[in-house]
């Protein structure tokens, strides 16, 4: 069976948590991609329904389980689990990057599709404020204020990043416009030079043919 690959692209949103369920056919790889900022805590849980593999004498059914892997744009592995069925993961991003979460079924044969459930959180949603409250002995109101403070900081960072991107794009546009202007001026001088050369060449040609004085 041919190997299939499906990519689901997730946009960058202020909301920092999502839950998704999908079916994973045999010998198939499905991935989700999401952009996440630098120094952001990412946590999640996953659960994959187990494949029941029955071996018959007249059929070939091979079951190697499923592989769960998280990588960045440089193909660095942040989390990997073979024969994955259920688990949790957590990591902190080092740079702003595109991260890819992949599930791959290595089983071949006539077996049911696996059901995959994924809950992923990052930023404010990934923090365990109940644990923070216990460690720092915070009151419920103080915990809520801490959460709102972290949320506000996250939103400010998002806007700061968007402003930075806008400035970078503006600088790129200005640089491109300058290059186009210089190229246009250069092209104009080339055309003027070519036209002048043609005039003198034709003048000499006509004089040589004694068509003009």
From Swiss-Prot:
GO terms for biological process: protein transport; vesicle-mediated transport. Residues 29-187 form the GOLD domain. Residues 1-19 form the signal peptide. Pfam families: EMP24_GP25L. Glycans are attached at residue 173. Its main location: Golgi. Keywords: Cytoplasmic vesicle, Endoplasmic reticulum, ER-Golgi transport, Glycoprotein, Golgi apparatus, Membrane, Protein transport, Signal, Transmembrane, Transmembrane helix, Transport. This is Transmembrane emp24 domain-containing protein 10. It comes from Takifugu rubripes. A motif (COPII vesicle coat-binding) lies at residues 205-206. Belongs to the EMP24/GP25L family.
